[in-house]
A protein has these predicted regions:
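Hydrophobic membrane-insertion alpha-helices, especially the h-region
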Residues: 4-19
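A conserved position within tetratricopeptide repeats
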Residues: 306, 340, 505, 539-540, ...
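Register position in tetratricopeptide repeats
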Residues: 291, 325, 524, 558, ...
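Serine-dependent acyl-ester chemistry module
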Residues: 149-359, 374-389, 412, 416-510, ...
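Membrane/wall-proximal cationic-aromatic binding patches
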Residues: 27-109, 378-381
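TPR/TPR-like (Sel1-like) alpha-helical repeat modules
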Residues: 329-344, 566-580, 587
Length: 601
């Protein structure tokens, strides 16, 4: 009796505290999807606080805002796309691989309705994707596509992360995450963070520059443990998919090998100062020869440096670049892969990550899992067999051409698992016809092409990209691409772009990403009233998202409609209370409308 009381009383108290915290509204839901009625229809919308379990709130990344019908419409084939920022479509998800995949499938099978739901999120890794998979299993998916692996070292609980403990055991990670699903656990997390803090955690988002101080050697014990955690998470993700009876397309991960030099390189700790000095002398001599175009002579000197330390990643990149210049493509590929694998700032899926993925594919042969070696297939279709700047804006994020190529690769495997009822109604069309149709569906305007290259240019103009030896040529390439778009732009281009948006929206009026691009087009070209109109339509479609409300408010303010602008800023803040830009704009309007001498205007 006493034992029962000793057990039940604390449990009762904990349950009472948990209930009390929920009643007063403390904490956040850890579900990926939340129910919401939009225009009288039931939808599931992404929870902007879903990643609070994995990131400090100020650094948390949000999923795409697009709503999904709570009950899948009859005749719809729903595909969940799982992954990180590369699958998300960074730097612009409106032209991401999921968007191209959906467009391509609808071109090939016009009698069917496809819905590719992108549940990929920037900066996450397999520790986050496993809970996402468990949620997707509840929502009537017909297929999953998994493209993940770039963030295993720097994402939550990775070996080089700034968000949490570094590479703890899977048991520890899952226990902590389970505890944070409770309001008590969230309260404990807040108290502990408040008491101890973490000076290593940035106050604001800084991209991959945040991880620059957490460099990892090739055989760092934390790095090795992170690989095993990835293996365990991947096995469980596939197990969840099998349990849901969903066919899964699992892909290896490609990256920029040719034109993205390592971000950081490390020498072994046991290298003597004398040997290091000799290595540095040889490296500089090789560099001088390489710059002068004497590639074979440079290779000979680099080989001497490699005899001292072959694992310095920048050295392998220089060796690979010289081999490529000499048309020794096979050896160049090996060297450039080794450069990536030894990069001390590990933000690209490396050989060991892709081997774990291939192991999982082979292990599940004959099951509901279908493998695709996208990394190899992308190499096969790249100049000299080595992926580079033609397909990637920087280290891992695809250009529009890269996303389209990956979508074509994935579509081949998707087609193998589609029901005969769908495949009987269509099939692959001529490549040029498919490309044109996809670009028309997504409204790939000249204005958007230049806009996204401009975003990429801004990104690589900051750390850690500026420290790359490949930086100057990548900067030049971005500028050249923007100039190339300019060369195709004529006085009639804005009208043509406008019509392209209109036609695409007539076909897909509920496409919020497409309408968002249209709103930006109007705003940037000075057609502010039309920008407001498109923004208001987005707000109606996405009442749960703060960013369209902020956009409408900011354009209203430029039109001098301060009352309406303030209303939209307030709406944005009701949705996302911690929205500093909206708070700042609202305060600016209040100051403008109030003078101590005159009172309220």
């Amino acid at each position: 009796m006493r034992l029962a009381a000793a057990t039940l009383v604390p449990l009762f108290l904990l349950g009472f505290l948990e209930l009390g915290l929920r009643v007063v509204g403390y904490g956040y839901s850890t579900r990926l999807f939340l129910p919401l009625q939009i225009a009288g229809e039931n939808f599931l919308v992404p929870n902007e606080k879903f990643t609070y379990r994995f990131f400090p709130p100020g650094l948390a990344r949000a999923p795409l805002s697009s709503p999904m019908a709570a009950i899948k419409p009859k005749g719809t084939y729903r595909i969940f796309l799982l992954g990180e920022s590369a699958a998300y479509g960074d730097p612009d998800p409106s032209f991401g691989v999921g968007r191209y995949l959906e467009a391509l499938l609808e071109v090939r099978y016009p009698t069917s309705d496809f819905e590719v739901v992108c549940v990929a999120i920037t900066a996450i890794n397999s520790h986050v994707i496993l809970p996402i998979a468990k949620e997707c299993a509840k929502h009537d998916g017909d297929m999953w596509v998994i493209y993940m692996g770039n963030n295993e070292m720097v994402g939550p609980y990775g070996a080089g992360t700034v968000f949490s403990e570094k590479a703890p055991s899977l048991e520890f990670v899952r226990s902590v995450l389970a505890l944070k699903t409770t309001r008590l656990g969230q309260l404990m997390d807040q108290v502990i963070t408040g008491l101890h803090g973490n000076s290593a955690t940035p106050e604001s988002w800084g991209g991959i520059a945040m991880f620059s101080k957490n460099q990892l050697s090739y055989d760092d014990p934390n790095r090795l443990r992170a690989y095993e955690n990835f293996r365990g998470n991947l096995d469980d993700i596939l197990r969840v998919g099998k349990g849901a009876g969903v066919p899964v397309i699992l892909s290896t991960v490609a990256c920029n090998l040719r034109d993205s030099s390592p971000f950081a390189s490390l020498h072994p700790t046991n290298l003597t100062s004398k040997r290091l000095e000799e290595w540095q002398r040889l490296f500089q001599a090789g560099n001088d020869l390489e710059v002068s175009g004497s590639f074979q002579a440079a290779l000979d000197i680099y080989a001497e440096a490699a005899a001292i330390d072959a694992d310095f990643s920048e050295l392998q990149f220089r060796i690979g670049s010289c081999q490529l210049a000499l048309n020794d493509n096979a050896r160049a590929l090996e060297s450039l892969e080794r450069a990536r694998d030894n990069d001390a700032l590990s933000v690209r899926a490396d050989t060991r990550i892709n081997k774990i993925i291939m192991d999982a594919i082979h292990k599940n042969t004959g099951s509901s899992v279908t493998g695709v070696d996208a990394a190899q297939l992308i190499s096969d279709q790249s100049p000299n067999g080595i992926p580079g700047k033609e397909l990637f804006y920087e280290h891992v994020h695809f250009t529009m051409a890269g996303n389209y190529l990956l979508a074509r690769i994935l579509a081949e495997k998707v087609a193998e698992r589609l029901p005969a009822l769908i495949t009987a109604g269509g099939g692959e069309r001529p490549a040029e016809e498919e490309s044109t149709a996809c670009n028309r569906r997504l409204a790939v305007t000249l204005w958007d092409q230049k806009r996204v290259w401009d975003v990429a240019l801004g990104r690589i103009s900051g750390a850690p990209f500026t420290a790359q030896s490949s930086h100057a040529r990548n900067l030049q390439y971005c500028k050249a691409r923007m100039q190339e778009v300019d060369s195709r732009t004529t006085p009639s281009s804005p009208a043509h772009d406008d019509q392209m948006y209109k036609s695409a929206l007539e076909a897909e009026p509920n496409d919020s990403l497409l309408r968002w691009n249209y709103a930006q087009f109007f705003e940037r070209t000075g057609r502010l009233s039309e920008a407001v109109k498109q923004g208001e339509l987005i707000c109606e479609r996405l009442p749960h998202a703060s960013w369209p409300h902020y956009f409408v408010g900011s354009v209203m303010a430029r039109l001098g409609k301060t009352t309406e602008a303030a209303d939209y800023f307030q709406r944005a803040l009701r949705i996302t209370p911690d929205f500093p830009q909206a708070s700042k704009e609202l305060e600016r309007i209040r100051r403008r409308n109030f003078s101590p001498a005159q009172g309220t205007k």
